[in-house]
UniProtKB/Swiss-Prot annotation:
One of its GO terms (biological process) is symbiont entry into host cell. The active site is at 306, 328, 396, 399, 422, 432 (o-(3'-phospho-dna)-tyrosine intermediate). Keywords: DNA integration, DNA recombination, DNA-binding, Viral genome integration, Virus entry into host cell. It comes from the Bacteria. This is Prophage integrase IntF. InterPro entries: CB (IPR044068), DNA_brk_join_enz (IPR011010), Integrase-like_cat_sf (IPR013762), Integrase_catalytic (IPR002104), Integrase_DNA-bd_sf (IPR038488), Integrase_DNA_bind_dom (IPR025166), Phage_Integrase (IPR050808). Belongs to the 'phage' integrase family.
Length: 466
């Protein structure tokens, strides 16, 4: 073994015993390696391993174990014996193994630990492979992981599981289309995000997104705006995932061209019930064959709640004794609102139905869906609108109608916002207004009474659902 003269005295003085012992071991069996000599070299009976040392390169040996024979490198680094496996003798030529042993000794002579050098090289190779794999990851692969996160995770904002409707929006807006429509004829259309599914994530640049927005906004601006918001949340999530981190270039939220192309998501001006339409609407909704859907739609209008908030109502959330309802709120977590007389009677009818599990943690508005609660009440609402000969009004339009119709009773804005679960918009509302339930009830009952009067409905002890 070659030892530089500058280190010779120091090494002999510091680890004299180790070097001498190691040299004796190497001198025990040293022969010039040949193919035939290595073939005949075997493990003696009763031993776990044995070594045959090369006469040409003193740091190279052939180690025989019960399973195989391999070339090994052995030397001294920092005063301690260092041994590394080079490879199986069937995979390495003798001259190549000698060259590798010389290379490893050269590293030691220059003060480098060969084990660390090897680990660094492996890490670099793995890093290059990982980067190569990253560039090949498509949008659809990462999107499926994101959907799984939505199904099993919780929202960082609300600290609760994501709603069924929110997850369904992601699925529908990324659907490739071509499936038979559940209602109507013909195949379904592809969602706005479908054109991105086969795209490598590394190509999801701000310029590409700007061009995508420019195309999609022409025929469906509001849906495209919604799809963009979902896409932006997905990109933010992916940048926090180790396997997707750093793949998507640029910042969509800060890119001028992207922000310029995002369509304005504006609600339709007529997506709201007018007071003169209330009579026709109630008459049609109350005549629906499905009493659960009928009650659901009426409660939605008379509470101003979000569609999923009412759909997720359980019997344990309804307090008939103290006339209150606990609503799972996406802003505050939950809110308590009054259980007004007409709504109370609607729910009483459902509670008395044979299949109701009012004494359990059952859904108020149950259905045959997988979750057990009402999922898609739009079809029932659309039938009622056709029957009433009214223009299309969305389920969210019923929530909008509550806030609009409340102005006829001159209800304070903060009262309506608290009932509907709107985020406080003023400093006083946010920090100082904590209205008791009785005060909310006073105004909420006024709103309900006015709406029912306009609809020509008289409150009785028992409400006729039909």
């Amino acid at each position: 073994m070659f030892i530089p003269s500058i280190y010779l005295h120091q090494q002999l003085h510091y680890c004299k015993t180790a070097i001498l012992n190691w040299s004796r071991k190497m001198a025990l069996s040293r022969q010039k390696f040949t193919f035939e000599r290595l073939r005949r070299f075997t493990l003696p009976e009763g031993k776990k391993q044995t070594f045959l040392w090369d006469a040409d390169v003193t740091t190279l040996a052939c180690r025989a174990t019960s399973g195989a024979k391999a070339f090994v490198f052995q030397s001294v680094y920092a005063g301690k014996t260092l041994r590394m496996t080079i490879g199986n003798i069937n995979d390495w030529k003798i001259d190549d193994a000698r060259a590798e042993a010389r290379r490893l000794q050269t590293l030691i002579d220059t003060g480098i630990d060969p084990r660390i050098a090897k680990a660094v090289k492996i890490a670099e190779a793995e890093s290059l492979q990982a980067e190569s794999r990253k560039t090949k990851v498509t949008f659809s692969v990462a999107w499926e992981d994101y959907l799984q996160e939505l199904r099993t995770g919780i929202s960082a904002k609300t600290k609760r599981p994501y709603s069924t409707r929110y997850i369904a929006d992601h699925i529908n807006l990324s659907s490739r289309g071509g499936e038979s429509k559940k209602r109507g004829q013909g195949p379904t259309s592809a969602g706005p995000l479908a054109s991105l599914l086969n795209l490598p994530l590394s190509e999801l640049t701000p310029d590409y997104i700007a061009a995508w927005l420019s195309t999609e906004r022409q025929n469906r601006p509001t849906v495209t705006a919604h799809a963009y918001r979902l896409l932006r949340a997905f990109i933010k999530w992916s940048n926090y995932q180790k396997k997707y981190q750093g793949i998507i270039p640029g910042d969509l939220a800060q890119d001028y061209n992207v922000r310029k192309m995002v369509p304005v998501s504006a609600s339709k001006a007529d997506d709201c019930l007018q007071k003169e339409q209330l009579k026709s609407w109630f008459s049609a909704v109350r005549s629906l064959n499905n009493p659960i859907a009928s009650a659901y739609l009426q409660v939605l209008l008379l509470t101003g709640a979000r569609r999923e908030e009412i759909a997720s109502l359980r019997w344990s959330d309804v307090d008939f004794k103290w006339s209150s309802m606990r609503i799972k709120d996406k802003i505050e977590g939950e809110r308590i609102i009054p259980l007004t007389p007409y709504v109370s009677e609607l729910l009483n009818v459902l509670a008395q139905s044979p299949n109701s599990d009012v004494n359990k943690e059952g859904w108020v508005f149950r259905s045959n869906s997988k979750s057990g609660k009402i999922i898609e009440p739009r079809s029932a609402h659309n039938r009622a609108l056709v029957l009433a000969e009214l223009p299309h009004i969305s389920l969210h339009g019923l929530r909008r109608s509550f806030g609009t119709l409340a102005e006829w009773v001159e209800v304070p804005t903060g009262i309506v916002a608290q009932i509907m679960g709107h985020k406080p918009s003023a400093l006083a509302e946010k920090h100082y207004r904590r209205r008791p339930l009785d005060l909310l009830r006073k105004w909420h009952e006024k709103i309900e009474t006015w709406i029912l009067n306009e609809a020509g409905i008289t409150i009785k002890n028992n409400v006729d659902m039909r």
